[in-house]
Regions:
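N-terminal capping segment at the start of a domain
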Residues: 1-24, 320, 377-381
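Short beta-strand segments
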Residues: 72-74, 144-146, 195-199, 220-222, ...
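Catalytic-core environment of secreted peptidases
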Residues: 60-116
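Alpha-helical metal-binding/catalytic segments enriched in His/Glu/Asp
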Residues: 71, 100-152, 215-221, 231-252, ...
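Metal-dependent amide/peptide-bond hydrolase catalytic core
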Residues: 173, 238-407
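Acidic/histidine-rich catalytic neighborhood of metal-dependent amide-processing enzymes
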Residues: 111-212, 260, 271-272, 283, ...
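A non-catalytic alpha/beta surface segment that caps or lines the substrate-entry region
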Residues: 19-66
């Protein structure tokens, strides 16, 4: 692994503006770099569904020994991301364990840095390039770079179920009788390709063992309009119904793995009119299906009871944004990650996340997907930074993961 090169590559990517729906320049840069490493590069047709100016990037590199491994990160960033000026500086860093001086990459302060997720892409590229340059044995390698991840995982959701199947016209060390979908060639249907999503906080060696189901609530409450000063008795306030429902809903942290929130209420037309309609939006999450469905039912019941009691009606709609992904300590993929971390001297930390990532969607499409911490800190803010050693260690980790699957 070339520590200077991974930093240079990251700084180059940071300078490319790539907000959601406008990832084409970043995708073109990545396609060129992957082609230089020997990958066959293609883009899917997801842009028609996502509205992005490019599709998801899918690249394959034939291996020298049987087996297959895949890595994923996302091309898009949140805003503000126009004219990012990356700064490398030394600062005092304190965490739960130590206080130390560390070299970091941060933005000049007016924008995000975009370590989320360009640090993930840079680490994947450097890890793979190091394997290729060293002539080390390697399994077949797939790289997936998604669009619109920051927009409720639109890019990965639009990925066809068979999009990562190894191309029939491309040689593969693991060529065999593969099942359809995201399975590695030569794998039995019960053996989907291990896919590592580099897109979480936490130092390299952090393994996201679980990420929740995510359901979104949209409700429309109907009351009856009336003049608020002349005949309020004739009206039924839709906003009052919404308030009564929210007041009785279990919200916040429900248990150690379940949360719920109402984040948007809108209704009414004027202060002197009893509001005839109101719209409400919320969500619930849990690692476990029975608990998230119970929470969903409780929120629905609160809305229906309030509407009935106060003389209105309500229409409730729930949408599953993505399913949960849960790994156990004894899973093979976790064992391989722990062995790879040990090989490059990284401490392992098992973490459960309250948010989703592309791994949630890709697991539902048949991959054995798991999210890894890459060291990004304060992401989605102008205070975002990443320690240079974390960027370099993540590239080493990618290299070690590839070696682990070449055994």
């Amino acid at each position: 692994m070339n520590p200077d090169r991974v930093l240079e590559s990251f700084l180059e990517m940071v300078a490319i503006e790539s907000p959601s729906w406008h990832e084409a320049p970043m995708a073109a840069c990545c396609a060129e770099k992957l082609a230089e490493m020997g990958f066959t590069v293609a883009f899917d047709a997801s842009a028609a569904e996502t509205g992005s100016d490019t599709g998801n990037l899918i690249a394959h590199l034939p291996g020298t020994v049987p087996g297959r491994v895949a890595f994923s990160a996302h091309l898009d960033t949140v805003k503000p991301c126009a004219g990012i000026e990356a700064v490398v500086e030394t600062r005092h860093i304190c965490d739960d364990v130590t206080c130390r001086m560390a070299e970091v990459v941060c933005s000049a302060g007016d924008t995000i840095l975009s370590a989320d997720d360009k640090a993930g892409i840079a680490a994947i590229f450097e890890g793979v390039r190091s394997v290729v340059e060293s002539d080390a044995v390697r399994p077949d390698i797939t790289v997936l770079l998604t669009t619109c991840e920051e927009q409720s995982l639109l890019g990965s959701s639009a990925l066809a179920d068979d999009a990562l199947a190894w191309p029939a016209d491309l040689p593969a060390a693991s060529r065999g009788t593969a099942a359809e979908g995201l399975l590695g060639d030569g794998a039995a249907p019960s053996e989907p390709v291990p896919l590592f999503v580099l897109d979480a906080d936490g130092a390299p060696g952090t393994i996201i063992m679980g990420a929740p189901y995510h359901w979104t609530l949209r409700a429309r409450i109907e009351g009856r309009a009336a003049h608020a000063g002349v005949e309020p008795e004739e009206g039924v306030s839709a906003i009052q119904i919404a308030a009564a429902a929210v007041a009785t809903m279990p919200l916040g942290r429900i248990d150690e793995c379940t949360t719920a929130n109402v984040g948007h209420i809108e209704g009414g037309v004027a202060v002197n009119i009893v509001p005839a309609a109101c719209e409400l939006e919320g969500e619930c999450r849990s690692l476990y299906e029975d608990r998230v469905l119970a929470q969903r039912d409780a929120m629905t019941a609160a809305l229906e009871e309030a509407a009935e009691r106060l003389g209105g009606t309500v229409e409730v709609a729930w949408e599953l944004d993505y399913p949960a992904v849960v790994h156990e300590a004894g899973d093979a993929i976790v064992g391989h990650l722990e062995a790879a971390a040990a090989a490059c001297g990284l401490p392992v930390c098992h973490v459960v996340s309250g948010g989703g990532a592309d791994a949630n969607v890709l697991s539902a499409k048949g991959a054995d997907a798991i999210t890894l911490g890459i060291g990004m800190t304060n992401f989605h803010s102008t205070d975002e930074y990443i320690e240079v050693t974390d960027l370099q260690n993540m590239a080493r980790y990618v290299e070690a993961i590839i070696a682990e699957y070449a055994c």
